[in-house]
Amino acid sequence: MVDALTKQKQEMQKFQEAEMLKHLDLQYKNEIIRSMEWLAEKDDTIFLGQAVNYSGNAMYNTTKTISDEQKIELPVFEDVQMGMSLGMAYEGFVPITSYPRFDFLICAVNQLVNHVDKMTIISEGQYQPRIIIRTSIGSRIPLDAGEQHTQDHTQAFK
């Protein structure tokens, strides 16, 4: 009887913690949506990546209020996506390039460290690309996407 009661209390505590997290996540998500809408007010802002125009991951819900004219849906080809972002930045746009998982951003590191990172130096200050990179890190709630989709590579980018 005591074990069943203890187990019931533990389950109730887990439920209450999950409910609190839902509330926090909702507030956090709302702030992301507000920031995306604020960025979209500027004519030079372009959103590109996977699931920016069609559902497919949690990031989609943060851009669904943005005008379709400001969004470019892309297939899975991360290196090209970063290259496109750099090209858009050269033309005066501010691309907001979305990688649904940090693991996917790793595939774009060549463009990031060999081109985006060096362009201001190579062009002697003529080009200063402004690119906003969005990704999610280590999400295991509500769905654990497994080891290849929940890694945190933050230290590698420092």
Language model features by range: what are they?
Residues 2-158:
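Thiamine diphosphate
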